[in-house]
Amino acid sequence: MYRSGGSFFYASNESNSQSVFYLVHANTESYNTFHIHIVKREHRGNGCENMKKGMWGVVILALVLITGLSVFYWVDVGEKVVTASTSVNGQEFPICSVETGKKQIAYTFELSGTNQKQEQVEQLLQILRQQEIPATFFATASWIENNRSLAIQICQQGHEIQGLSGQEVCVEQMTARACRKELQTLRETIGTVTEEPCVFFRIPGGEYNNEVLRTVYACGSYPVAWSIDSLDWKDYGAENQVKQMLQTHTLRDGEILRFHAEGENTGEMVSLLHPQLKEEGYEAVTVSQMIVKENYSMETDGRQIPESQNKAIFS
């Protein structure tokens, strides 16, 4: 037996009259799925019993290959984040804001699938287009499945769609296995409406534990929360809500703003808020444009500090 790339060659020569060669190929494109392809080549001969033995050998080889590659794959995934320090004193944190060194903000909108309010979403898209705001939409797999045409419209308008957990359980009850499964479902579902990869993951309530956060990072994704919650679900008028946002928070570079795309006042809030932020010199960017994926550290408030900014601060 010898290995070439992702393939293993196995030769069985149980008798002088027959030689059977097997090519076992493993495809690990999917992060938790292994596809094993067995191709058999045999010379002339009669020895059915020997062929059965040969097949048992290749089955065992395939099982060993699955186990071995699964270990190697997870080690490889872990290496993707080795250049980043994602914990502080053993505590993991989601990314809530970024030390950009520029006056940038990221508008994020959640689409949970609980309310089928396409009219509000379409109104929001119109406002984003008028204000020339690129945004990030965090959507559940069920919302995309139920609103496929609207999801495509979001992407065609220049926005990005990332993953939002649809789990009904609280984060303390979410297992690493359930988290991995949901990440894969989100990647596959989002992949049906856009070619842009799903690499960012959000839990609606913003509550994370170490197990979930480490699982997200290990899968090559990044947990994203927010630094400013618009509280747009409260119905006391868009103007009052924007005023409270600006009075409650002192804006910093790299703030991530949270909205609900299906909110009654969300569109109006954005139309009132953005001109004020723009006047102060802030530029709207997507989460993908703001967050760095390597060479960074985290602070206890979830602020991501790129290595370049860290050097600038202490130089």
Model regions and ranges:
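Short hydrophobic alpha-helical segments enriched in small aliphatic residues
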Residues: 11-14, 26-28, 33-38
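N-terminal Sec-pathway targeting helices
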Residues: 45-64
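Hydrophobic alpha-helical membrane-insertion segments, chiefly the h-region
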Residues: 64-74
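Active-site beta->alpha N-cap acidic-glycine motif
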Residues: 78-174, 178-192, 196-197, 292
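C-terminal domain-boundary segment and adjacent tail
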Residues: 88-101, 126-135, 145, 265-315
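Structural recognition of the beta-strand scaffold that forms the well-ordered cores
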Residues: 106-108, 135-139, 160-163, 199-202, ...
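Alpha-helical scaffold elements lining the catalytic groove of polysaccharide deacetylases
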Residues: 115-120, 169-194, 207-253, 265-272
